[in-house]
Design a protein with these regions (language model features):
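TM-loop-TM module centered on a large, flexible mid-protein loop between adjacent transmembrane helices
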Residues: 87-88, 94, 125-130, 202, ...
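Extracellular loop-to-transmembrane helix junctions
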Residues: 37-135, 140, 144, 250-259, ...
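Helix-loop-helix junctions that connect adjacent transmembrane segments
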Residues: 11, 16, 55, 131-136, ...
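A generic transmembrane alpha-helix motif of multi-pass inner-membrane proteins
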Residues: 371-377, 406-485
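Membrane-helix boundary/coupling elements in multi-pass transport proteins
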Residues: 104-119, 220-236, 294-332, 367-379
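Membrane-interface loop-to-helix entry segments
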Residues: 137-191, 247-252, 370-384, 404-416, ...
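Membrane-interface "cap" regions at the ends of multi-pass membrane proteins
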Residues: 1-53, 66, 70, 405, ...
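C-terminal membrane-solvent junction of multi-pass transporters and transport-like membrane proteins
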Residues: 162, 334-344, 381-434, 438-441
Length: 485
């Protein structure tokens, strides 16, 4: 069965350009994870809270995230449609759950895109010698978003080429720098290997346990978004094979390469005290061993990786909006479901940009965006995995047709337990660490978004939009032996 015939079996027709291969689909997920951005932005916080031993939180979180990635990979194989979280939960638990899963994921990607663009602008404004004022950073953020929109406007092929090159530069740059620093640290014996297991003195084990949990937030914030490739399923050749591999490979490589970079930088750190309080600790470590042009090259690599993350986020969010619009699940669905001559959802692209820009106007923008984005991501993960578990346990006939047989109850239960633990951690750490003003802003923003969705849901309360009554999952069942797990 061809890709177009598979799509028709779900009740849809081919509208987007199906031109992505293995590496491009992998690059979408890897860019959204944006390992380099997370490490450069939050390394100092992790080191300050947990000491050198905090590097192992990356591995622990990576293992937990891989449980979720395995569930998502199988769902992507069974349901190769754009609008992944929306489509998956719709097939497993119905339209109501799908509506909320889709909208929460829209919030996650729009706020995430705004936050990443703001972070890039924060680097670029002082780099070009401009006054580091909030006004200049916001203007640079808008310029970044518009640039990403222009690239997306002219087709997925152009966007994928830019993203592919950026990912290759990020992987090569981070691995080379990590290996060089690791080699230098081992040759010079800057620190023994046991240094990686040291931590700040705490009066009790419980005290350090909380510090370690705090330091693990860097990994929790960074190692998500691996499922983004599923949102370009209708633009990927053989998506039932390539998207699952992209999901798993992007998460595994982000964990492996990220751990390598963390170990290399931590063993090479000249002073934990200085690095943990430095505004750009990884650049401080690089500058301690290499000349300025290497530091400038590292900053360029980070900037390229962050821009690729913005680009991939925009690609992902516009496909999600478009997929929900063709089913009548968003306002102005007819307008947002339009596809241009370049075979991209052009109206969704230019609607997403100003909405994302609005989030950068708040004071304490980074805290608010991070809170909304991270909570939205893990809540959606919970809805998807919970729907999969529900279909297995509560609806055997549905599970037989629509849930891959080897997405076992045990795997779903373990993944859901992990997600709930992360949500509890995020809630606890947000309450004890965020300022009262920022917390109020975040809660108000969440309340306004929820109220808008409820109003829209009440106004639009009619049948099931224009979507097919149920995707024809029975047309492509997995056999007992078919599994990528």
């Amino acid at each position: 069965m061809s890709d177009e015939q598979t799509l028709q079996a779900f009740g849809y027709r081919q509208e987007l350009s199906r031109s992505l291969g293995y590496f491009s689909s992998f690059a979408i997920s890897f860019s959204v994870i944006c390992m380099t951005s997370g490490l450069f932005a939050d390394y100092g916080d992790g080191l300050r809270a947990g000491g050198p031993a905090f590097v192992w939180s990356w591995l622990i979180v990576g293992v937990g995230q891989f449980l979720v990635a395995m569930v998502f990979a199988q769902l992507a194989r069974q349901i190769p449609l754009s609008g992944y979280a929306y489509q998956w939960t719709r097939s497993l638990a119905g339209d109501r759950v799908a509506f909320w899963a889709g909208w929460i994921m829209i919030v996650q990607f729009i706020t995430g895109m705004a936050g990443v663009a703001y972070a890039l602008a924060s680097y670029l404004v002082p780099f070009f010698g401009l006054p580091n004022s909030n006004r200049n950073v916001v203007l640079a953020t808008i310029a970044t978003l518009v640039t990403a929109a222009l690239i997306n406007h002219f087709g997925i092929k152009l966007a994928s080429v830019v993203n592919d090159v950026s990912v290759m530069a990020e992987i090569l740059g981070s691995v080379v720098i990590g290996l060089l620093l690791l080699g230098i640290a081992l040759i010079r014996r800057t620190h023994p290997l046991s240094f990686l297991f040291t931590y700040p003195h705490q009066p009790s084990f419980g005290g350090y346990f909380q510090a370690f949990l705090t330091s693990s937030l860097m990994s929790v914030w960074t190692l998500g978004g691996f499922e983004a490739a599923a949102n370009v399923a209708e633009e990927t050749h053989l998506p039932e094979k390539r998207i699952p591999m992209a999901i798993l490979l992007s998460e595994v490589l982000a964990v492996v390469f990220g751990l390598l970079v963390l170990i290399g930088f931590t063993l090479a750190v000249p002073s934990v005290e200085v690095a943990s309080h430095h505004p750009t600790p990884l650049l401080y470590i690089i500058g301690s061993y290499f000349p300025r042009y290497v530091v400038a090259g590292a900053l360029l690599m980070v900037s390229v990786a962050i821009f690729a993350c913005v680009l991939a986020n925009l690609t992902t969010i516009t496909r999600l909006i478009w997929a929900m619009a063709r089913d009548g699940k968003v306002p102005a669905s007819h307008f947002l479901s339009k596809v241009s001559d370049y075979k991209v959802p052009v109206n969704a692209i230019w609607v997403a940009i100003p909405i994302a820009a609005v989030f950068t106007f708040w004071a304490q923008v980074e805290v608010v965006i991070l809170a909304l984005c991270t909570f939205a991501m893990y809540v959606t993960y919970g809805l998807v995995v919970g729907a999969c578990l529900w279909a297995n346990r509560m609806s055997p006939s549905l599970a037989a047709a629509q849930v891959p047989r080897r997405v076992s109850r045990g795997l779903c239960a373990a993944a859901l337990a992990w997600i709930l633990a992360i949500l509890i951690l995020l809630l606890y750490m947000t309450v004890i660490s965020i300022s009262q003003k920022a917390l109020v802003i975040a809660l108000r923003a969440a309340a306004v978004l929820t109220a808008c969705l409820l109003i829209y849901l009440l106004v639009r309360r009619r049948a099931a939009g224009t979507s097919p009554s149920q995707p024809a999952l029975e047309s492509a069942p997995l056999s007992e032996d078919e599994s990528i797990i």
